[in-house]
Amino acid sequence: MSASNVLALTTLFLATMFAETEWKEFTSSEGNFRVVFPETPQQQKGTERNLHQFSAAAGAESYGLTYADYPPGTDWESVLNTERDSIVNGFGGSVVDEKRTSVEGYPGKWIRFVGQNTSGELAIYFVGHRLYLLHAFAPKGTPRPENFSTFLNSFLLLSKPKA
């Protein structure tokens, strides 16, 4: 078998092995959101701040969404910065890019960071009194997965929260 045939077969094998995962829409009426995950997410619930966590993996990539409720009048930017710092520092990392963003008119931040072994992106929004934190993580040194955008850009609110 020629070298070009071996290369073609290897490429075909790898393309099949790493074929795109069919992402699934996940809706939480209690959380008032919809997002796509690479598989049905695992769910955890905490008691503090009505904390809810949803997570799923696609190979070495990890995707998650957490939401928590804060008292009315909470300084949203302070909360977002605290969450950003906690996650980035937890990975022994540093922020390499940060931008203000929004979801349906509610303020947020998009953050890209690199840690000791992990690189990732965060999208954090403050909607009324609720914080939504989306994360996408991959091993450090791998090219940015296209799935990061698939996940982070899929987040939508089901309805405007009551004031």
Regions found by a protein language model. Give the residues of each.
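N-terminal secretory signal peptides that target proteins for export/translocation
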Residues: 1-2
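Bacterial N-terminal signal peptides
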Residues: 5-16
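Cleaved targeting-peptide boundary
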Residues: 17-26
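Surface-exposed amphipathic alpha-helical segments
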Residues: 29, 39-42, 80-91, 132-163
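Signature of long, low-cysteine stretches enriched in small and polar/charged residues
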Residues: 30-53, 84-128
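Solvent-exposed coil/turn segments that connect beta secondary-structure elements
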Residues: 31, 59, 68-70, 116, ...
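Short acidic, Gly/Pro-enriched loop/turn segments at secondary-structure junctions
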Residues: 47-56, 159-163
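A short acidic-to-branched-hydrophobic micro-motif
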Residues: 53-81, 133-135
